[in-house]
Amino acid sequence: IAACRFLQERLKLPCIQGYAFGFLEHGEPGVEYVKPLDFCSSQELKEDEQMACFEYIFSYLPLWYPREKAYGICETVEGSRRNFCYSKIDSSYLR
């Protein structure tokens, strides 16, 4: 996280997103989403970093999982971010 924050402003959020995607890409098969969601929820991240992180991971869920599994993953997300997760999945499947 600290390394990302030392980058130029325009690169900070993509760097955070890249870390999260690395967790997704190299996660345990079938539960690849657990570590990136934990990372995005980290209290070490600022609010804008968390939002960018979640948005990025949520947008990949429909590419990695069937719709039912993606919705089930959204169920594990806390509070208002759950609806954001659903909206990212719905918009992906409506294309």
Map each language-model feature to its residues:
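Non-catalytic tandem-repeat scaffold regions and their flanking low-complexity/translocation tails
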Residues: 1-95
